């Protein structure tokens, strides 16, 4: 999967979260959940976009970690929304699954980037010797 495909999936997730929130009831608890998930569910798209424009590997890694945190939080809120039955499970479950898949991809990207950075660092150390 290339970065454009991943960006598109992140944007789709944000749009789906917005639509789900608009379908939530207007109870106090629903509105509290809505505020939380609208923030965490839309920020991965913006943060991933920023990561793709990073000026260095370290900057890229830091931005990916923000994406990871927001996706994890979104999974958390989606789980609560499902368990509290604030929205039909048939609507939330696919969203939850996509969020978890994106989280897995980002975690793998973080691990890959760290491994590559460490390898490059080791190569620089060897070159100095």
Language-model segments: which ranges?
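Short, C-terminally biased terminal segments at protein or domain edges
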Residues: 1-129
């Amino acid at each position: 999967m290339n970065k454009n495909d991943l960006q598109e999936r992140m944007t789709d997730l944000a749009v789906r979260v917005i639509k789900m929130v608009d379908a939530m009831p207007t109870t106090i608890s629903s509105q509290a959940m809505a505020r939380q998930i609208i923030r965490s569910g839309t920020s991965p798209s913006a943060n991933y976009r920023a990561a793709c424009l990073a000026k260095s590997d370290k900057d890229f890694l830091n931005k990916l970690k923000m994406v990871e945190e927001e996706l994890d939080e979104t999974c958390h809120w989606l789980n609560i929304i499902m368990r509290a039955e604030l929205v039909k499970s048939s609507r939330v479950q696919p969203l939850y699954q996509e969020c978890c898949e994106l989280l897995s991809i980002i975690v793998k990207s973080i691990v890959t980037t760290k491994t590559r950075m460490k390898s490059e660092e080791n190569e620089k150390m060897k070159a100095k010797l």
